[in-house]
């Protein structure tokens, strides 16, 4: 199935806005020059790493605004028949817990980057994977225990989160049914009394 042209454009990250700005600047300076995408991406990545938080600020603001735009448009977007609507992620929902491997990565990523500066994200991940595979089962235990605790906490949090928005099923509607029958019985009794009165009048 082709892409739905009415589907909202995906949200852009602060880095994507930075790259877009750099590309536009490059086109203005060199309108006729062709761009080596790989080389251009590498330069953008290097420049982004050396930028201060203040320099990145305007791009982060643009990303925040675009996120608001995207979330607003996705709420009102109705996908074509046969295509499932992408489930909107509630930012307040509990985040899924990290696995033992990801907890290990968070601990050792700075070390790997420090040992080999300039590594790409992919190469860092590869080295972390190798380190993890070289660990003994005993060495992995602390990370697995932490992951287990995080999973238990997540399961409690997600249950509480799901129940928070639910309205409990009330019983009054069912309880009202017998009451209605009682009323009907009362009406029948009244009818019977009326009939008795009529009979008395006939006897007179």
Curated annotation (Swiss-Prot):
Keywords: Chromosome, DNA-binding, Nucleus, Repeat
Cellular component, GO annotation: chromatin; nucleus
PANTHER family: HIGH MOBILITY GROUP PROTEIN B1-LIKE 1-RELATED (PTHR48112:SF12), HIGH MOBILITY GROUP PROTEIN DSP1 (PTHR48112)
Entry GO MF terms: double-stranded DNA binding
Record-linked SUPFAM superfamilies: HMG-box
Keyword Nucleus: yes
Compartmental location: Nucleus; Chromosome
Residues in the signal sequence: none
Keyword check for Transcription regulation: no
Record-given protein name: High mobility group-T protein
Location, primary (coarse class): nucleus
Function description: Binds preferentially single-stranded DNA and unwinds double-stranded DNA.
Biological process, per Gene Ontology: regulation of transcription by RNA polymerase II
Pfam families, per the entry: HMG_box, HMG_box_2
InterPro entries: HMG_box_dom, HMG_box_dom_sf, HMG_boxA_CS, HMGB
Positions with biased composition (Acidic residues): 181-204
């Amino acid at each position: 199935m082709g892409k739905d042209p009415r589907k909202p454009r995906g949200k852009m990250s602060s880095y994507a806005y930075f790259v877009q700005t750099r590309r536009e600047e490059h086109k203005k300076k060199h309108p006729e020059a062709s761009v080596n995408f790989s080389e251009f991406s590498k330069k953008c990545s290097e420049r982004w790493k050396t930028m201060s938080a203040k320099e990145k600020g305007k791009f982060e603001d643009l990303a925040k605004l675009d996120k608001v735009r995207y979330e607003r448009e996705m709420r009102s977007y109705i996908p074509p028949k046969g295509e499932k609507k992408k489930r909107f992620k509630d930012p307040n929902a509990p985040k899924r817990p990290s696995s033992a491997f990801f907890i290990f990565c968070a601990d050792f990523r700075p070390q790997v980057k420090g040992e080999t500066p300039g590594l790409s994200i992919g190469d860092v991940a590869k080295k972390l994977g190798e380190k993890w595979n070289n660990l003994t089962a005993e060495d992995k235990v602390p990370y697995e225990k932490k992951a287990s605790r995080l999973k238990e906490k997540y399961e409690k949090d997600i249950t509480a989160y799901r129940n928070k928005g639910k309205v409990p099923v009330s019983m009054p509607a069912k309880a009202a049914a017998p009451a209605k029958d009682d009323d009907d019985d009362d009406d029948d009794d009244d009818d019977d009394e009326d009939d008795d009165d009529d009979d008395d009048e006939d006897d007179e």
